Amino acid sequence: MMKKWLLAAASLLMVVTLAGCGSNTIATLKGGKVTQDEFYKEIKETSAGKQQVQQMILQKALQEQYGSKSLTKKIDKTYNTYKKQYGSSFTSVLAQSGLTTSSFKNQITTQMLANAALKANKKVTNADLKKQWKTYEPKVEVQHILVEKKDTAETVISELKKDNSTKNFTALAKKYSTDTGTKKDGGKLPVFDSTDTSLDPTFKTAAFKLKTNEYTTTPVKTSYGYHVIRMIKNPGKGKMADHKKTLTDQVYAKWANDQTVMAKVYTKVLKKADVTIKDKDLSDILSSYGVNAKKSSAKSSSK
């Protein structure tokens, strides 16, 4: 879908560019020519073309209402972080996703503007925080040993009963673990919390039950095999009041990925933008947001 949008955007940009050059002809051939009007008519009648026009209107409305110098600095900082992370392979990595440096930056801009609109139009209530708190777990650090067979995991657990030190667990990970990505580092995983989606839910549930220095006394079965998990650091859940900012951020992150929530936010943004549609063939372009844009007296340009 993203590629279709980009294609439509490139096509519309071509129309604008040619119009700026004062030429109505895109191409000539024996017996005829292709004009801007013909090209525009074809593009606007496609679902991708209509979707792109819709996105362009929304983008401009978001920029007008929520754009700022401070936001621009955040956008640049985020973009440069990714650029530094991927180094010389940055452009090639983007190309694999059908993106250019320019379209990627536009993507970051759209995301940050959308987040700003979300926070301005929907506030997190105490009820929202309490709901989030029910499943909240703080960031923890664990190390694990992954094996194929249950009896191997039980052997590891027997060894840990004799010595549950970090040193011994690390040695056991190097000896038994089939997780080649972590065994050299003693099975250590990046820190994670309850919002993490990269780990198996069963693994997370077992891990969150452990206090610092504790380990799972029975093998934890997932689709990858059998795990033995040791908690390196678990700060404990504590009180909700101590995690209000984190909980608020988590609620907003959840809403940002909820199409129903964001559609309502965009509806407010577009209504405030007071949009007028000049092309009658696109008069219902914002109907999916429940917005009836003003219609200009101008005729359709699809002739």
Swiss-Prot record:
Example GO biological process: protein folding
Gene3D superfamilies: 3.10.50.40
Secreted among keywords: no
Residues with a covalently attached lipid (N-palmitoyl cysteine): 21
S-diacylglycerol cysteine lipid sites: 21
Main location: membrane
EC number: 5.2.1.8
Signal peptide annotation: 1-20
Leading EC class: isomerase
Highest taxon above the source species: Bacteria
Membrane topology type: Lipid-anchor
Keyword set, alphabetical order: Cell membrane, Isomerase, Lipoprotein, Membrane, Palmitate, Rotamase, Signal
Keyword Metal-binding assigned: no
Matching SUPFAM superfamilies: FKBP-like, Triger factor/SurA peptide-binding domain-like
Residues of the PpiC domain: 137-233
Disulfide bonds: none
Protein task: Plays a major role in protein secretion by helping the post-translocational extracellular folding of several secreted proteins.
Family according to the record: Belongs to the PrsA family.
Name of the featured protein: Foldase protein PrsA
Record organism: Latilactobacillus sakei subsp. sakei (strain 23K)
